[in-house]
């Protein structure tokens, strides 16, 4: 995966909904190396296709973590909440 946002490398992303126009609603997990250690974030994300074959993404409602296990647990919890709707 070669996706980045706000300095975070997106290391996991799962689509939980797709509109008929191809817009995807996702939960993503990001990682960033800093001088203070590795930081993690989970975001909700909307991704839609562009006419040139690429895609545009927006990221919002971030949950920030300094522990990978907690970030991954948050990632899975957020996905579970979306699938249970």
Regions found by a protein language model. Give the residues of each.
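Charged, amphipathic alpha-helical segments
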Residues: 21-30
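Negatively charged, low-complexity tracts enriched in Asp/Glu with abundant Ser/Thr
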Residues: 1-21
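Short aromatic-glycine-(Arg/Gly/Cys) micro-motifs in beta-strand/loop hairpins
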Residues: 29-62, 78
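Conserved catalytic or regulatory cores that recognize and/or transform ribose-phosphate-containing ligands
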Residues: 17, 39, 82
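A short, charged, amphipathic alpha-helix used as a generic interaction element across diverse proteins
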Residues: 57, 66-83
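Short intrinsically disordered terminal tails
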Residues: 1-3, 80-85
